[in-house]
């Protein structure tokens, strides 16, 4: 959701037409969920600092209910490199609009049933509300559907998903669309921060000043704090890329990726 050069959307809704997500989980169900989440994390050793258990093993025994909030459709664009990749000259609205169209076509959903749309983003001007709203219309979704955007840095798309799911569970809406979009070619992190516009009083707070630390330095600090050397980071990166290549060859991404025509200048 909302990676540097891609866009992704998810559609949520009740599994049954008449179901509404208004019933809160029982203490037992909540405890089961905590146990599943805890079981998803595997104790790490010196040779595997970030080893995780398969998601399937954590959710296979999940209790099902008619008021469960479920993902009905999940799509995304392909991933490209910032500043020199296939999407470097493609605006965010042109990345997001095809996904709205794909969601509408694949689900055969009546747009009137959609109660809300929320899109996560970080660097777009105007909190990304304008570009996401334009993408909504370019994606053939009517103006009657409200849209909002959210910025929680790298978790922006995930926060949008959580917010829409929460709205369904609380009974505010029955169906919603959530996702994220970002282009670090069009809007890089530095361009969205102008230190001259901040109060001079931020210098009085170490934490306030720390908000200006770039993510690159933050990652170095985290690696040092948790004693994760570059060799282990590189090893994990290689393993991740190998898994991605294997998944591509097996066609595991074919269904979720929506083709987007792009012009490179």
Cite the ranges covered by each PLM segment:
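Short, high-confidence coil segments that cap the C-terminus of an alpha-helix
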Residues: 172-174, 253
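N-terminal, intrinsically disordered, basic low-complexity segments enriched in Arg/Pro/Ser/Thr
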Residues: 12-17, 24-25
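Claisen-condensing/thiolase-fold acyl-transfer catalytic domains that form or cleave C-C bonds
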Residues: 123-130, 134-137, 141-143, 150-172
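Low-complexity, disordered terminal segments
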Residues: 1-5, 9
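Compositionally biased, low-complexity segments
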Residues: 3, 14, 52-56
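Intrinsically disordered, low-complexity proline-rich regions
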Residues: 20-21, 29
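Conserved "HGTGT" condensation-loop signature of ketosynthase/thiolase-family condensing enzymes
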Residues: 27, 32-145, 181-265
């Amino acid at each position: 959701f909302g990676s540097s050069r891609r866009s992704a959307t998810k559609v949520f809704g009740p599994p049954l037409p008449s179901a509404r997500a208004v019933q809160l989980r029982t203490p037992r169900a909540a405890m089961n969920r905590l146990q599943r989440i805890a079981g998803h994390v595997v104790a790490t050793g010196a040779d595997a600092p970030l080893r995780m258990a398969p998601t399937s093993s954590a959710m296979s025994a999940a209790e099902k209910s008619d008021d469960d909030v479920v993902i009905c459709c999940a799509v995304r664009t392909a991933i490209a490199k910032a500043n020199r990749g296939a999407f470097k000259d493609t605006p965010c609205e042109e990345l997001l609009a095809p996904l709205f169209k794909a969601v509408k076509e694949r689900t055969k959903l009546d747009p009137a049933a959609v109660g809300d749309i929320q899109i996560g983003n970080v660097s777009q001007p105007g909190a990304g509300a304008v570009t996401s709203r334009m993408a909504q219309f370019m994606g053939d979704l009517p103006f009657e559907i409200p849209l909002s955007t959210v910025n929680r840095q790298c978790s922006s798309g995930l926060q949008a998903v959580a917010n829409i799911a929460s709205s369904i569970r609380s009974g505010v809406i029955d169906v919603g669309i959530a996702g994220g979009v970002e282009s670090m070619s069009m809007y890089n992190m530095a361009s969205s921060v102008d230190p001259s516009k901040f109060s001079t009083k931020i210098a009085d707070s170490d934490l306030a000043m720390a908000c200006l630390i770039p993510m690159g330095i933050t990652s170095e600090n985290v690696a040092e704090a948790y004693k994760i050397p570059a060799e282990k980071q590189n090893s994990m990166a290689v393993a991740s890329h190998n898994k991605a290549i294997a998944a591509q060859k097996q066609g595991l991404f074919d269904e979720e990726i929506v083709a987007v025509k792009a012009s490179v200048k």
